[in-house]
Amino acid sequence: MFVEGFRVESPRVRYGDGEIESEYRYDTTEVVAPPSPEKGWVVRPKSVTYHFKTTTTVPKLGVMLVGWGGNNGTTLTAGVIANREGISWATKEKVHKANYFGSLTQSSTIRVGSYNGEEIYAPFKSLVPMVNPNDIVFGGWDISSMNLADAMTRARVLDIDLQKQLRHHMESMVPLPGVYNPDFIAANQGSRANNVIKGTKKEQVEQVKKDIREFKEKSKVDKVVVLWTANTERYSNVVAGMNDTMDNLLASLDKDEPEMSPSTLYAIACVMEGVPFINGSPQNTFVPGLIELAIKKNSVIGGDDFKSGQTKMKSVLVDFLVGAGIKPTSIASYNHLGNNDGMNLSAPQTFRSKEISKSGVVDDMVSSNAILYEPGEHPDHVIVIKYIPYVGDSKRAMDEYTSEIFMGGKNTIVLHNTCEDSLLAAPIILDLVLLAELSTRIQLKAEDQDKYHSFHPVATILSYLSKAPLVPPGTPVVNALAKQRAMLENILRACVGLAPENNMMLEYK
C-alpha cells in the first residue's frame, strides 16, 4: 500500500514551530583487538543516544551550475521547467508527461511499516521537508556564451516536440562567463571558449564570489548550491608547499600558481562564501588544502563524479557477487559515446581522471572478504572509453565479469547497457543539490555533548550519488550501492525518530 505522507507519534519526537526534534538510539559495535595472539578478537555491542534537530522551513533555493550550457545543465534546466509547467509532448511511441523518474528524492519510496499484514510505503521526500524542485531558480557559468535554448538543441538529448515548447522559456537564459584554463581540459574544447573570465586566478575567484552574491540578490533566493557539471579536467598535481595545506593553497592563489584547476578555483570561491559546492566530475578538485579550508570554514563540499550508469551497475553487481561468496577475478568495462563529454575524454590526460574514478568502485567490496582474496589481491580491472560522434548522448556500456566459483569453476556475466547519459545524470544532479541543501538544516549531538553541531562539511550523505565518494579524513569509503542508500535513508529516518530499516520482520517469525 502507498501513502502520500505520515507523521511520527512517539515520546522521542517533537514537532515544533519550524523544526523537528528527535531522540535516536544508535546501536553499533566496538571491536577490540586481542591483547595477545592466542586470545581472540572481542566485539562489544554499543549504544549511543543522539539528538537530532531539523529545520522544517524550506528555503527558496538557487542552483548555479558550472557548465550550465552543457548537456547535463540544459537537460536538468529543461526538465525542471517542463515539470513546473506541466508540459506533455508526443513521440512516435506515445504522449509523454514531464516527470522526475531517476531521482531518488522525487521518485523512490521508503517502507514505513505494515498495516493488516500489508507493507506500507511512502515517498522518500516525505521523510523530512525538502525543497520542491519546481521552485528552484537556475543560473551558472559556461565558457560558451550560447543561450540555453540553443545549447539544448546542440545537445540533441530531448525530443523535438518538447524542445519547441521549452524554447521560449530558455532563450533568455545565458550563462555567465566561466573560468577557462586550456591546460586542464582537452584541446578540442577551445572552439567553445568565447565566454571566459579574464585576470589572475585570485581575480577569477573574486569574480565567482561576486557572481554568487549577485545571483542570490537578483533571484531573491535564500540559499545557493553550486555544482560542477563542466568538462572533466586532468588531475592536478598535489605538491608540498603548493596545495597540501590551506595556507599553502591560499598562498598559491595569491601567487597565481599555474597548477590550480578551474574547478578548484570555483570550490575556493564557494567555501569562502559559505555556499555548498559539489563536484560532479572525476578530477581531484578537492586537493588537501581545499578540504582543510572547507573544514575550517564549515562549508559543505561533496563529490566526486556522478554515479549514473555503468558504475552504478558495477557497485550493485560486485557487491552481490562478493556477498554471495563468489570471487570476481576480471572486470572489463568498455564505453563509447558521442557527446561533448566523450569528445573531452578522448584526450589521455582527462580520460585518466575518469579511469581513476571508475576503477576504485569495487575496492571496499573486495577488501571486505579475506576468504576470497589474499592480502593485496584484487580483480584485474580495465576501463576503456571511446568517442563515436554518431551515437551522441546515448552512451553504450559493455561489461564482462569473470568470477571463480565452486571447485575451480568459472562464471562469466556480460552486460550491455545503453545509458542515455544526460537523462540519467540530470536527476542525480537534482538529488545532489536537494540533499546538500537539506544537510545544512540538520543538526545533531551525542548524549555526552552540550551543543548541537552540523554534519561534517565533507558530505558523506551524498555518497550514494557519487562514483568516488569524498569522505572526511580517516573515514572508511563505502561504494556498495545498497549500503550507501541505507545510510542515507536511515539518517533521514533518525531525523524523525524512526528505527533503521533492518528487514528482520520478527513480528512474522
UniProtKB/Swiss-Prot annotation:
Localization in the cell: Cytoplasm
Gene: RINO2
Major place of residence: cytoplasm
Catalysed reaction equations from the record: D-glucose 6-phosphate = 1D-myo-inositol 3-phosphate
Presence of the UniProt keyword Cytoplasm in the record: yes
Family per record: Belongs to the myo-inositol 1-phosphate synthase family.
Biological process annotations from GO: inositol biosynthetic process; phospholipid biosynthetic process
Originating organism: Oryza sativa subsp. japonica (Rice)
Name this polypeptide is given: Inositol-3-phosphate synthase 1
GO cellular component: cytoplasm
Pathway linked to the protein: Polyol metabolism; myo-inositol biosynthesis; myo-inositol from D-glucose 6-phosphate: step 1/2
The keyword Lipid metabolism is assigned to this record: yes
Cofactor: NAD(+)
Pfam families per the UniProt record, alphabetical: Inos-1-P_synth, NAD_binding_5
Function, in words: Key enzyme in myo-inositol biosynthesis pathway that catalyzes the conversion of glucose 6-phosphate to 1-myo-inositol 1-phosphate in a NAD-dependent manner. Is a key enzyme in the phytic acid biosynthesis pathway in seeds.
One Gene Ontology MF term: inositol-3-phosphate synthase activity
Sorted UniProt keywords: Cytoplasm, Inositol biosynthesis, Isomerase, Lipid biosynthesis, Lipid metabolism, NAD, Phospholipid biosynthesis, Phospholipid metabolism
Tissues in which the protein is found: Highly expressed in anthers, but transcripts are undetectable in roots, leaves, flowers and embryos.
EC number per UniProt: 5.5.1.4
